[in-house]
Amino acid sequence: MCVIFPVEIDVSQTIIRDCQVDKQTRELVYINKIMNTQLTKPVLMMFNISGPIRSVTRKNNNLRDRIKSKVDEQFDQLERDYSDQMDGFHDSIKYFKDEHYSVSCQNGSVLKSKFAKILKSHDYTDKKSIEAYEKYCLPKLVDERNDYYVAVCVLKPGFENGSNQVLSFEYNPIGNKVIVPFAHEINDTGLYEYDVVAYVDSVQFDGEQFEEFVQSLILPSSFKNSEKVLYYNEASKNKSMIYKALEFTTESSWGKSEKYNWKIFCNGFIYDKKSKVLYVKLHNVTSALNKNVILNTIK
């Protein structure tokens, strides 16, 4: 997820992949496919990142399905049917510009102090939108204690066309941290909807963060008395799994004495201990938590 404006823009499920390129560099692929048939004005999108961006490239839409299938494969195993490029610098801020997008990356404190000026450099001048974004979105992006970087992306009309709607960011993480950008814009309800999958490699397991997130999840409403939402914290030799699932029981068609237990809507975190890869699936769930997941990298 990310902080996106205007809020009426219809986007598909968010897909995130963050992978190590070398000891100093990682690549973040952040996919929010625009579902609106035609953009009539620029879309503003921001998310936290743990270091400065060094390059931005567009990639083919097919990458979305490849990343999603890797994550889905891990969670499908839980659901058993039967169970026992640089454009220039302005104000010391690096900008990357293309015909259909404009990207900059700066510390949160810099963004806060020069917010309108930075957006103007992106040719984003809608005064009402800037004021609303500053009120509802900026507070979730600026962490005064840690002063994380913020990627500012302006997607221009025409970006939604063609086969290259995927943006890839090569960046240099600072402090051996990786930020998985789940935070939303602030709303008045206090509940936040999540529809995102993520694949992150070369990171350490953080059970405390994952437990907090999963315990806060509200799964889709039950329609049968036999349905239960259950919390799992499981570990094996190769994996650690923290997730919630909807379980229910059905009777066998051969006789009422036989019962089948079903597990569906598995949502949470799976960590592969051998490959050091984190898989995240938060599909159509809500939570009172509105935050990023911040992980330590493998040194």
From Swiss-Prot:
Presence of the UniProt keyword Secreted in the record: no
The GO molecular function terms of this record are: cysteine-type endopeptidase inhibitor activity; cysteine-type endopeptidase inhibitor activity involved in apoptotic process
GO BP field: negative regulation of apoptotic process; symbiont-mediated suppression of host apoptosis; symbiont-mediated suppression of host RNAi-mediated antiviral immune response
Q: What are the entry keywords? A: Apoptosis, Early protein, Host-virus interaction, Inhibition of host caspases by virus, Inhibition of host innate immune response by virus, Modulation of host cell apoptosis by virus, Protease inhibitor, Suppressor of RNA silencing, Thiol protease inhibitor, Viral immunoevasion
Classification via Gene3D superfamilies: Baculovirus p35
| InterPro entries found in the cross-reference section | Baculovirus_p35 (IPR003429), Baculovirus_p35_sf (IPR036562)
One Pfam match, given by its short name, reads P35
Family named by the database record: Belongs to the protease inhibitor I50 (p35) family.
> What is the annotated role of this protein in its UniProt record?
Functions as an inhibitor of the host RNA interference antiviral response. Inhibits the insect host cell apoptotic response initiated by the viral infection. Blocks as well the activity of members of the caspase family of proteases. Required for late and very late gene expression.
Can you say what this protein is called? Early 35 kDa protein
